[in-house]
Each structure stands twice: as structure tokens, then as C-alpha cells.
From Swiss-Prot:
It comes from Schizosaccharomyces pombe (strain 972 / ATCC 24843) (Fission yeast). Solcar repeats lie at residues 14-95, 102-185, 190-274. It is found in: Mitochondrion inner membrane. GO terms for molecular function: thiamine pyrophosphate transmembrane transporter activity; thiamine transmembrane transporter activity. PROSITE patterns: SOLCAR (PS50920). The chain crosses the membrane at residues 20-40, 70-90, 105-125, 157-177, 184-204, 249-266. This is Uncharacterized mitochondrial carrier C1604.04. GO terms for cellular component: mitochondrial inner membrane; mitochondrion. The keyword Amino-acid biosynthesis does not apply. GO terms for biological process: mitochondrial thiamine pyrophosphate transmembrane transport; thiamine pyrophosphate transmembrane transport. Belongs to the mitochondrial carrier (TC 2.A.29) family.
Length: 283
């Protein structure tokens, strides 16, 4: 077994709760810090407006606290999604460590599968977060949940699910593929710096590739009755706003995803290393 394979074997052989805890902690901290970018990005996508007027209108009419609107739901979303994604990826990597396949392909497939699993696990929270971010006033969680259920039943919590799977699966696959490749090159810089820089590179690259799909999915989640299908929504945005409409909010999203992924991966790797040290026989 080569050094890289041996490192992977050790890295992905930790107890499941290590990845759950590290993934959950890193995702929750990340979410709190990037919440304002997420609120503005979602409003730009669903209103097809630009950054300055959306930010100005939000703060003037609703106050600074509006930038964290729906953050309780979003924190739960990030906790569930982050824990599920990192657990799934680590266990899949452990299971495929002896697979005779290109490392980049394995990372992509494991990342895609992890993203799909995490999406299915956390999707109702994602739907509620998107709706809350678009409201002018912060709704109470229980009444809002009851309202969604009364209007559309269980399906109301899963609008555009298949399209989210199509978007998030490949996004997660690209992220982990780019991250592992970047981290392998940058590892001589040390764990903290290599994980931070690799998170920025992988997050930005993956987001740029999948952003148009994200715009359509967010629009479908917010206005599910306005469109017949993913294609209908895509064409409607394109006809009304062109290519720019599909990338509306990309600049804000990049401001969010670059530091967000840097924070997530830095805290995740450091937490995982700490748990590994504490669990070692020598500790």
C-alpha cells in the first residue's frame, strides 16, 4: 500500500461519532458566520435583483437582524447536513480504499453519494430555511411548519427534491474531488493552512460549476406552483433575465462559499485530528 493510500486508510478509519461531531460543529459555526450572505443570495435569486438594492432594502425595512432571518432553521439544517455528509463520505472512502479506480473518480463518486444522502436527510429544513429567508417577518417555526403541511402535505417539504439531488450530488462530488486533490498538493503547508486554502479552492470551483442549477432549485422551492417543471423554470428565468439571471447572486455566493468552506474544513480537520489524538492509545 502506497503512502497516500495508507494515509487515507488511517484518516477514514475513525469511529462514526468522530465524523458526526466534527462535521456538525464545523457546519454550525460556519453557518452563523455566513448567514447574511445566504439571506441576500436567496433574495437576489428569487427577486432577480442585484446586490445593492436587495441589501439596502433588507436592512432599511427589516433591520440588520433580518440578515440572520431563519437562522435557527438554517443552523439545524447545517448541523444535520454537515454531520450526514462527512459521515457518509468518510465511511464510503473507508469502504472503497482498495478499489482499483482513479483517486479523483473515487473522491467524486463518494462525494456525490454523500451529498445525496445528506440532502435526503436534511431537505425539509432546507425548504423551510429558503422560505424563511424570503419572508419580510420572521415566522414562528411550528406555525410555519403546520402551514406548509396544511397547504401541500408532506410533499410541501420536498419541492424540487429531485432537482436538488441533481444539483447537490455533483456539487458535493466536485467539492470533495477538488478538496482532496488540492489538499494533497498543499499538505506540506501544514494542516491548518492546507485545509483552509483547499476549502476555498474546492468551494469556489464547485459553486461556479453548479450555480445555475442552484438558482432554479431555489426558485422552485420558493414558488413551486408557478412552474410546471425544472425546464419551465429554467427557461422562464433565461427568457426574462438571460444568462445573468441564472447566475444572479453568484458574487454574493462566492463571498459566502469561499470563507464558509475555509472555516468548515479548517474546523473539521482540526476537530478530527483532536479526536484522533484523544482516542489514540498513547493519549
Amino acid at each position: 500500500m502506497g503512502l497516500a493510500k495508507q494515509k487515507d486508510s488511517q484518516e477514514f478509519a475513525q469511529p462514526v461519532w468522530h465524523y458526526t461531531l466534527a462535521g456538525g460543529i464545523s457546519s454550525v459555526i460556519c453557518r452563523f458566520m455566513i448567514a447574511p450572505f445566504d439571506v441576500i443570495k436567496i433574495r437576489m435569486q428569487i427577486t432577480q435583483s442585484s446586490l445593492r438594492p436587495v441589501f439596502k432594502e433588507t436592512v432599511q425595512k427589516e433591520g440588520v437582524r433580518a440578515l440572520w432571518r431563519g437562522n435557527v432553521v438554517a443552523e439545524l439544517l447545517y448541523l444535520v447536513y454537515g454531520a450526514a455528509e462527512f459521515v457518509a463520505f468518510s465511511k464510503l472512502k473507508h469502504l472503497t480504499e482498495n478499489l482499483a479506480m482513479n483517486d479523483h473518480a473515487v473522491n467524486f463518486l463518494c462525494g456525490t453519494s454523500a451529498g445525496i444522502f445528506a440532502t435526503l436527510t436534511s431537505y425539509p429544513l432546507d425548504t423551510m430555511r429558503t422560505k424563511f429567508a424570503s419572508y419580510a417577518k420572521t415566522p414562528h417555526m411550528l406555525p410555519a411548519t403546520k402551514k406548509i403541511y396544511a397547504e401541500a402535505g408532506i410533499k410541501g417539504f420536498f419541492p424540487g427534491l429531485k432537482f436538488s439531488v441533481i444539483q447537490i450530488g455533483p456539487y458535493a462530488g466536485c467539492f470533495f474531488m477538488f478538496y482532496r486533490a488540492s489538499e494533497a498538493v498543499l499538505s506540506p503547508l501544514g494542516l491548518a493552512l492546507s485545509s483552509t486554502l483547499s476549502g476555498v479552492i474546492a468551494g469556489a470551483g464547485s459553486k461556479a460549476i453548479m450555480f445555475p442549477v442552484d438558482t432554479v432549485v431555489k426558485t422552485l422551492q420558493t414558488f413551486p406552483s408557478n412552474y410546471k417543471s425544472f425546464k419551465d423554470c429554467f427557461l422562464s428565468i433565461y427568457r426574462n433575465s438571460g444568462i445573468k439571471g441564472l447566475y444572479r447572486g453568484l458574487s454574493v455566493s462566492m463571498l459566502k462559499v469561499a470563507p464558509g468552506r475555509a472555516i468548515t474544513m479548517l474546523i473539521y480537520e482540526q476537530t478530527l485530528q483532536g479526536l484522533r489524538t484523544l482516542s489514540s492509545p498513547e493519549a
